[in-house]
Every structure is written in C-alpha cells, then in structure tokens.
Amino acid sequence: MVMRVQTILSIRKMKNNFAQMLGMGLLILIAALFFTTLFTFKIIYEEEVTALFRQQHYAAVTLTGNFTADDTKKLEASPHISTIEKRTVQDFRSGDKTVRLISLSTKLNQVILEKGRLPKSTAECVLISQYARQNKIKLNDTFTVNGQKLNVVGIVRSPEYIYYSQSERSFSADPKTFAVAFVSKNFFPSANQLLLASTTSIQETEIKKLLPYQSFTAQKDQINYQMYQGDLDQFVSFAYIFPTIFWLLSFGIIFIILRRTLLKEHKQIGLLKALGTTNFSIIGIYTRQFVLLGLFSSLIGCLLSYPVTELLFRIFNSMIELPTLAYHIDSRYWVISLVISTLGCGVFALCSMLDILKEYPAISMRQRIPKVKRTRVPSRFLSSLSFNTRYAFAASLRNKGRFFLMVLGMSASTGLLLFSLGFDDSIRGVADHYFQTFANYDFIVQLPEPLPLDQTIIQTSSAINRQEAALQLTGTVHDEDYPLIITSSDITILNLLTEKLDQGLVIPEYYAKKWHVSVGDQVTINEKKATISAVLPLSMGLAVYTSYDYARTRFKELPAVYNTLYVTSDHPSKGVKQLKEKNLFYTTAEEDKQTFRSLLDNMGILIVLLVICSVILGATVIFCLNLMNLTIREFEYMFMNIMGYSKRRILQTINKENLLQLLLSIPLGFLAGNWLLAAIKEQFSQNSFAMQPSIRLESYIFTALVVSIISSFRLLISNRYIEGLAIVEGLKVQEE
C-alpha cells in the first residue's frame, strides 16, 4: 500500500513537469543513441577489417625496387620471414584517367572475387569493384591500358583498397578517373615489389643486410591502413564529445527542476517527515521518475541505434569497400549507456535533495522567508536604463542556476554547431591553402626509373614553362616511414624557404609535434642524425624536405639522380599532350584538389546529422528552461499585468533577458567550437595529411544566426503562456 502511494505521488510529480521531462528524455535519448551507435559501429568495423586483413593475408611489409629471383632466395634464407611473393605495380595514363596495373599475388594481399574469374593470360584482367561500379563496366568488356586492349574477366575487391587511395596527395581518389586492374603473373617481365609476411616483426635493419631496395613500407605505414586507424580514432572522439555534452546538460536540468520542486513543496516534505516517512522513501518519491526517465530514454536510444547504424553502414560503404558490414548488438555499450543515463539521473536528483533531507520536519514546514537585499542607491548607469532592462538584469542575477544552465546549453549548441561547420570548412580549406601558399605546380611527373640530374627528359617549350627535379625516397623516423623529398636548394615551384634547405630538414608542423622537435633540434632519419632547419604549416603533401647538398652530408652514398618532376604550364592541355607523347606518368593539380571534393561529398550526410543534433540540443534546452522560468514567474507576470504593464512590455522584458544570455553564450560557444576542433585534429591527421582548424566567417555568422533564431522561439512560447494566465491562477502561486 505504501509503495502504491509513493508510486502515485511520483507519477503525479512527473505529470507536473511533463514538458520539461520530455525535453530531458530527448537529450538522454540522443546521448545514448550517439554513444551506442558510434561505439557499436567502431567495434563492428574493426572486427570486419581485421578479419579481412587476416583472411586475405595482408602483407606485413612491402619492398619497392628492382628485384630478381636471387633477391627472393636471399630473403628465404631469413628465419624471420615466413612468406615472400613478387609482383609488379605500374601506373599508366589513359586519356584523363590514371590506370594502375598490378600483377596478381596468390599468397599475400589476395583479392576477393565478386564476379567472373581471375585472369589466365596476358590479354585478360580483373577490375577493382569501385571503378567497375562507378563506370558501369561489366564482364567481357574491353579495358584499354597504354594502347593494349584487355578483356575484363572478373570484378574483385582488395584488402589494399578498402580506402580507394592513389597516393599521399590523393588518398580518396575519384573512381571515375582512377582505375586499379589486376593482371596475370606473367604480364610483366620483371618485379618491382616484394610482399613479405612473418609471424614476428620484420626489422628493416635486417632486410637492409640482405638486399638493396628503394623503399620499405610496413603495413602500419600504408595509406590504406593509416586511414583505417584514423577512422577508428575519429569514431571514439565523436562517441565521447557529443554524448558527454548531452548527458551533462540533461543532468543539469534535472538538478534545477528538482531543486525548484523541493522549494515549492517544502511543507509537504515536512509533513511527510512528521508522519514518519523515512528519508529513503522521500528520495524514492522525488527521484523515481527521473531514474525511470533515464532508463527508458537510454533504452529507446539503444534500440534506435540499429537503424542509425545501418544508415551509417550505407554512408560508409560509399566511402570504403567493405560490403560485409552488418549490424550486431554489442551488449557492453548498451549496458554502459543504460548505467550512465540511469545513475546520472539518480545521482544528480539526489544531490539536489541533500539540503532539505537534513532539515527537521518543523523547519521544512515553516514559511520560507524571502531574502531581502540591502537597499542600494542605483548608479547613474543603472538609472539611465529602462525598467525592463533593469528587471532583466535582476531576474538573471536572482536565478543564477537557471541562468547559468541556459547560457551553458546555448553555448553548447553554438559550440557543436560551429564545430560541425568548422570541420567541413577545415577539410575544404586543405587543398586551397596548399596550392595558395605552398605548391605552384600544374603537374607532378613520376619517372619509372631514376635519371641523372644532368639528363633532361622534358624539353622546355610553350607548353612547359618550368620544371624542377626532386628525388622522392622513404625516410624512417622513430620506426615510422615518411616521404623524404630531396630537391635543389633554389626550388621555386614549392615554397620551401630555400635558404633553410641547405641547413637541414624542412618539416611540416604535424611532424614537429609528433616527433616533439623544433627548429635546431636533431632527429635520426634512416639511421643518420639530421638538424631541423624550418617548420612549415602544411596540411597536404606532408613530407620531409631537404636539398641535395645537405643530403650528401648525411648520406654519403646518395646518387645525383631524380625520379620526380614538378612542372608548371600556361597551357595545361598542351602540357598534357607533350607528357603523353613522352609516355610519362603524371598527376595534375586539379586531380589532387578533386581528392578533397570527393571526401567532402561522402561526408556531407554526416555533417548534416551533426548540425541537426546541435540544433536539437539548443532547442530542447531553451524550451525546458524557458518553460520552467515561466512557471516560476507566473505571479510576477500577473502582478505586472495588474499594475498596467501590457503583454508587449512583459515580452520585451523576457526578450532583453534572452539577449543578455545570447551575448554571453554565443562568444562562449565560439570559443568552445574552436577548442573542440583543435582537440580532435590529431585524430583526423596522418603522415600524409594533417587537419588544420580553419573556420570561415560565413560559418560564424550562420551559427550565430541559427542560435538566435532558435532562441527567438522562446518569445513565441512566452507569448502563448502569458496569454493563458488568469488572475485566480496568479493568486494561487503568490506564495512562490
């Protein structure tokens, strides 16, 4: 019977705050939905990719160079290497497209056949699924590469191309202009790559003793693998940021609502104590509804994670090639979400009751004496303000808890909205910043074999204005591989602080932070000590740069050769024609820019989802707290109405308080948005790409405008509420 009475009382109190509790439930639901969805997605994605790498025997190390059968035998003698396989990878230009031909490997980096069969002769090939799907290529179609016609006999997927990356500058290539085709083993006369696998770690120092090579690329240093690891970190970052903010704000609203309810019902609580009701029972009466709210809201959020995760799978499958992604429940994150929501609601509700639980029944039942402040002579500034303005200031200072929570909620909404738009701006600005401040090339030409520096392969003409040579190698720092580009000290196509190239290494800021070095410090690169001479604010085309003269002081055996050309042209179409005549492989600046456009097209839906959640957060907080303020100030508004204040003047008072909150929350939100963007930039950076926070002025204006519009709905709610007030109802709440 007692339990039944307590339950009835709890339901009645829930009914009294139904609108606010509905808003809090929405915040908790979204927090649980975000948390459960992103962590479930991360776990499923990690499991699927790990299984794919294991099943298709993803190579632990890829060696690049010119290899013979004798080189393979040398490696077979090593007890640490379990599997070795030769193959050839070569890029060709075919019109506006880049075609990468790869000889099939049967032991390592095995492809997955989706349709057809594998090639058996040199006249056949299989195409990677991303390109075939985008260009609507079917079995038995003809695929032309370098003037040779190949019959398409199959469509495949590859563990190397889960992310459709072409190079360090094109890590999200356009399937319309970049094709990957696999050919038979005997298609190429020689091999330029060796794939290695081992049950233990393969050390580069050991391989160096066995045979010469151009580059040693461990699995963790491949672009495909780095992007996979980067996405895992990004999921975790988003899974913590958004849910934490939503949970904390909902718990704060619970604290404020229950605190106010207890002040209103202090006589009832005193009566319950006098009748022998224990503190535990009183806690149950007032906190049960909030605990149930947290439990059921988070449970609904967990249930909704299924369709939302499926939606993310579809979005992500447009960015990566992993059709095996399928939803399954991970009970750990469901339990964590339910526990955080339920305990958080219970703990914050309990904290709001601590003061009144300590009181004796007589004190609780006593009439509350309003706090009277010492009368002060108003300053000249305050006297010059209107009554409405002074009332708005006084009301804000009198209700510090609600005022602070309103400002905090609007700041959080502003910060998350600016963060979402700024994330989009930062990615968009990478390529523009790179070509505006650093790179001035129109083409990058990759030579199949290094040439002596005094040998020119392209003649300067009306189509080719300027060309500058460079040697692109791999540099190992702290057991990680990085692009090492050696060029002349007077290079102008790249803005490299030429006076610093002869003094040491010029590195991007991202590398400097990662290695914990600054100008003048030394690092060990390829087992040689080198000095950092300059640090550049680069986001794209990340590499270690130095001059031939300085490199020869570090690496005595360095040959005077080049394998890369940076080319400028006033007539790009004529330049393309000249490069094609020379049968040279090249990439254009426009193709590098297209990489980021493709990435943004794929991420557009995710950005929209983040923006929607930010708007929901702001609208919910404003609705809940505004409704609470209106309920509490019923008598004040009734008194103002009786004293002759029109509804328009009362709304002006509310509007001025709203403007004061906006003036505080929007700048705080801007600071929070910038801080969030700076905090997560490391998770969105890799050895080939570093995100630099960059927010456009338009994003600031749009964010402030959206938050102001959301806040203006407060006036509509207030107008409707004040219209419904009656004198009798106002007298009922006079005591409060």
Where are each of the predicted segments found?
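N-terminal Sec/SRP start-transfer signal
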Residues: 1-33, 261, 287, 291, ...
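Alpha-helical transmembrane segments
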Residues: 15-25, 30-58, 309-315, 319, ...
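The feature marks short, hydrophobic/small-residue-biased sequence motifs that occur predominantly
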Residues: 38-39, 79, 85-120, 151-159, ...
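Peri-transmembrane interface segments
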Residues: 41, 45-49, 99-105, 203-249, ...
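Juxtamembrane segments of multi-pass membrane proteins
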Residues: 62-63, 387-514, 518-521, 527, ...
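Hydrophobic secondary-structure segments that place a key small or acidic residue at a functional site
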Residues: 113-183, 499-550
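Small-residue-rich transmembrane alpha-helices
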Residues: 255-259, 265-267, 291-323, 331-358, ...
